[in-house]
């Protein structure tokens, strides 16, 4: 069987979803028009999201009649004509869900209609992402010139771990995403995720946005607080639309309203995880199209715009010492499995010039003594932790650490990149409950000239600029004092002390708003062991 295409070259295949909180609707409707050797079949599957649906087959001996039935059924469910399927969804009707597979096929169909350019041999010997859509002749030339270089087995294992689809699916399931889609490659398109971010921003505005967060600044921060700000509240249409375009599996429970910044932040974390997972899967799928004698994970590693090397035993020991530090409120301990040093990153930060005050010269006779050698000033850089889900690690290695998308009022200090000196704090963001093995990034961060804060401030970046500072340092109650140098940069390792200043924060955070002030130095694989109450008190 093969899917029949319309006059524009797009297949008669569509995935529809409809969520209506008021009626406890959370269902899908799949449609396909198939050619089976001259007979035409319209395949329909409908059911509740997360469960196996009911399948119906409609047979036709005439293609026009089959198309007419397909398009009429599509209009019945969406109130859109087939040629309008890319338009805005109609309220209280099914929405078209754009899958990654459909989006990729569409691009391929369009490229076939365009004239192919003459092959050009790229004389530059560069690493990193290879351009897609290259003509066959060019691929053959590149294949002959491929250097035979075996990658360290540890690196292959690393790539396999961070791109493991089963691990990704486990995390996505925990985030309530509809795992019934199958592998991440069969999930949503990246364009669909962008639409999801936009809807969440609209919902956030409807519950007050930054103004609502400012009104709660004087009170203790509660993770699941529903904002008590006078507003019309989030539109049910927007929430229904979001759930329809980003399908969730809630079983037979009523889909929850997205009516707080904490819930919006949780949904954004889901989209972030989906984005990273889909990007990794698309890369793997693209590699599988080309035959090669190389291991697929070696080829995947070669697409990275950076080099990774296993660290020496000495550095591994120092990183392990740093991981041994645990916050008193954290219920697990960390230990080192492996670590890799990042070399030649895609974006090398420029080192900020150090201002040296000129000492005024004394008048008088010239001294015949030679000047004493100048002692370099102590570095203000620190090695700090950044935690993220395993779904995001490959994307970060490809693109670097990115600033959050949208006006994220759920973040305590605005849209920066967050770092911590206590590793267990960063490990919280790795979703350690889902796996006993997580990945953390140990980053070189410029900590000079910070704006010091003792409570949440969502406009921290604006206050930082007004104060002519270069970063934000959120001072927590517990702060480490002891450090160990790793390749000349201090990293915090132990001896948590309580500061004298009054603060609403438990642990230190460093927030950066300029990419030149941080870079990834080590990718660290960490084992997570949950502690009992007795072990925590010891």
Curated annotation (Swiss-Prot):
| UniProt-listed GO biological process terms | double-strand break repair
Question: So which domain of life are we looking at?
Answer: Eukaryota
Primary localization: nucleus
Q: Which residues form the PARP alpha-helical domain?
A: 148-285
Q: GO CC annotations?
A: nucleolus
Q: Which parts of the sequence are annotated with region: Disordered? A: 104-133, 357-381
Reaction catalyzed = NAD(+) + (ADP-D-ribosyl)n-acceptor = nicotinamide + (ADP-D-ribosyl)n+1-acceptor + H(+); L-aspartyl-[protein] + NAD(+) = 4-O-(ADP-D-ribosyl)-L-aspartyl-[protein] + nicotinamide; L-glutamyl-[protein] + NAD(+) = 5-O-(ADP-D-ribosyl)-L-glutamyl-[protein] + nicotinamide
- Write down the PROSITE patterns for this protein, in alphabetical order: PARP_ALPHA_HD, PARP_CATALYTIC, WGR
Domain WGR stretches: 1-94
Q: What is the enzyme's main class?
A: transferase
Q: Which Gene3D superfamilies match?
A: 3.90.228.10, Poly(ADP-ribose) polymerase, regulatory domain, WGR domain
Q: Which UniProt keywords apply?
A: DNA damage, DNA repair, Glycosyltransferase, NAD, Nucleotidyltransferase, Nucleus, Transferase
InterPro entries linked to this entry: ARTD/PARP, Poly(ADP-ribose)pol_cat_dom, Poly(ADP-ribose)pol_reg_dom, Poly(ADP-ribose)pol_reg_dom_sf, WGR_dom_sf, WGR_domain
* Ways its activity is controlled: Inhibited by N-(6-oxo-5,6-dihydrophenanthridin-2-yl)-N,N-dimethylacetamide HCl (PJ34), 1,5-dihydroxyisoquinoline (DHQ) and 3-aminobenzamide (3AB).
- Gene Ontology MF term list: NAD+ poly-ADP-ribosyltransferase activity; NAD+-protein-aspartate ADP-ribosyltransferase activity; NAD+-protein-glutamate ADP-ribosyltransferase activity; nucleotidyltransferase activity
Q: Where is the composition biased (Basic and acidic residues)?
A: 105-126
Q: Which SUPFAM superfamilies match?
A: ADP-ribosylation (SSF56399), Domain of poly(ADP-ribose) polymerase (SSF47587), WGR domain-like (SSF142921)
Q: What's this protein's family per the entry?
A: Belongs to the ARTD/PARP family.
Role description: Poly[ADP-ribose] polymerase modifies various nuclear proteins by poly(ADP-ribosyl)ation, a post-translational modification synthesized after DNA damage that appears as an obligatory step in a detection/signaling pathway leading to the reparation of DNA strand breaks and programmed cell death.
Could you tell me which PANTHER family the record lists for this protein?
DNA LIGASE (PTHR10459), POLY [ADP-RIBOSE] POLYMERASE 2 (PTHR10459:SF113)
Task: Please state what the protein is called.
Answer: Poly [ADP-ribose] polymerase 2
Give the taxonomic lineage as stored in the record: Eukaryota, Metazoa, Ecdysozoa, Nematoda, Chromadorea
